[in-house]
Amino acid sequence: MQSTEPWSPSWGTLSWDYSGSGSLDQVELCPAWNLPYGHAIIPALYLAAFAVGLPGNAFVVWLLSRQRGPRRLVDTFVLHLAAADLGFVLTLPLWAAAEARGGLWPFGDGLCKVSSFALAVTRCAGALLLAGMSVDRYLAVGRPLSARPLRSARCVRAVCGAAWAAAFLAGLPALLYRGLQPSLDGVGSQCAEEPWEALQGVGLLLLLLTFALPLAVTLICYWRVSRRLPRVGRARSNSLRIIFTVESVFVGCWLPFGVLRSLFHLARLQALPLPCSLLLALRWGLTVTTCLAFVNSSANPVIYLLLDRSFRARARFGLCARAGRQVRRISSASSLSRDDSSVFRGRSPKVNSASATW
């Protein structure tokens, strides 16, 4: 995963970007003007996402990791997903500072590599974990009996471990081939990948394997489960809708970026010849969609807070001095299946079972 791309108003300036920078052939010959006011708007968006995502995801991790007794299956997925989002948002101040300086990276080569690697790993892990959670929800609703052997705590931990392992492998190119690259105008250095054409093919392949494929799995499971929503109970239906909201927001935030990123890879490989006007529009589109994708890292806690009364109750208790005793008194109310319940579902003195959707 790479940084967003702040393009210089000068001609032929080496660009760096989350969406794949460095100038090659046709792309190098086209002007790369900055998105108007991007140096002010983009850092503000990143810092806002950091301000929301850091405490929000940290609270979700704290809330789920301190649970006593057996952890429910979906709890494990959401815990790992929150951890991935937390790792993602921790890098946002660095990219915000670089964006504010017109794309010049002030933190040295080491932090450039580590931050790029962290973005790649956490983005990939998030996509794979959501795909795994989608499959689990489909099995819970569509195959509750036949899939019971697969829906065990051990299997879910193995799936999460495999997702992280795949994500770390997918992030290695960012660790190995990204670093400080001098801008062509000699003003400073930018955090960019090395301008090798072969890296574009690798990037496109990784995008297909770590984004397009998990996205397809998520959408198929979403469609299959949605067909069964009218036949499930109210509590299960509400729980599934919260999960679907999380997945839909992820798709809405990342799909535009994935499409434009693929087009940009193809353009840099000269497989998709584009005039300079369309290349500039593509670059600006990547800037906007990258911001949208980055903001997704702070979205899930907001979704839980808005849609789940039980989570709001637990959040209130968690912020109180007596949170420990009160949270331990929260009991399960309803479940998505007989052996699995949703993430923040519970009963508090002010939350009835109908509203405890997770």
Curated annotation (Swiss-Prot):
Residue numbers spanned by region Disordered: 339-358
Pfam families listed in its UniProt record: 7tm_1 (PF00001)
PROSITE patterns according to UniProt: G_PROTEIN_RECEP_F1_1 (PS00237), G_PROTEIN_RECEP_F1_2 (PS50262)
Extracellular domain ranges by topology: 1-43, 98-113, 177-200, 261-284
Superkingdom, natural source: Eukaryota
GO cellular component, one term: membrane
UniProt topological domain (Cytoplasmic) ranges: 65-76, 135-155, 222-239, 308-358
GO molecular function: G protein-coupled receptor activity
Keywords attached to this entry: Disulfide bond, G-protein coupled receptor, Membrane, Receptor, Transducer, Transmembrane, Transmembrane helix
Gene3D superfamilies: Rhodopsin 7-helix transmembrane proteins
Topology within the bilayer: Multi-pass membrane protein
Localization (cell): Membrane
Disulphide connectivity of cysteines: 112-191
Transmembrane segments: 44-64, 77-97, 114-134, 156-176, 201-221, 240-260, 285-307
Function text: Orphan receptor.
Similarity remark: Belongs to the G-protein coupled receptor 1 family.
PANTHER family linked: CELL ADHESION MOLECULE, G PROTEIN-COUPLED RECEPTOR 25
Record-given protein name: Probable G-protein coupled receptor 25
Source lineage: Eukaryota, Metazoa, Chordata, Craniata, Vertebrata
Gene: Gpr25
